[in-house]
């Protein structure tokens, strides 16, 4: 397990979370402002604001912070690709629970990859709101060299 270590130490089968929190309008508005998402359903009236699907990237960081408090490790990670399936809109003020599982770790062309699958659920009734699969490059190891 990577608990208490670096994100670069994650191995298949490691469980991240669950972490519970309440989605705040401030986080949604600031994220949307930074990403130039100016549509009213992201930055309008508070009772109408929904979470943009890509905001789940912050949940991955939330899980890393709890499971791997030492940070990224000797090699920074690069967000490589992701797939996000939204099952239901997530409104501001919702109580949420996010959890993840490390599914794969592999090397391709000298680059180490880690695949994490996450689920964002309603903390009230367990409904699946968003399913997310993320692949990050953890390190590059040149032939015969260190990362």
Give the positions of each predicted feature.
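HotDog/MaoC-like acyl-thioester-processing domains
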Residues: 1-7, 86-147
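Hot-dog-fold acyl-thioester-processing enzymes
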Residues: 1-81, 143-147
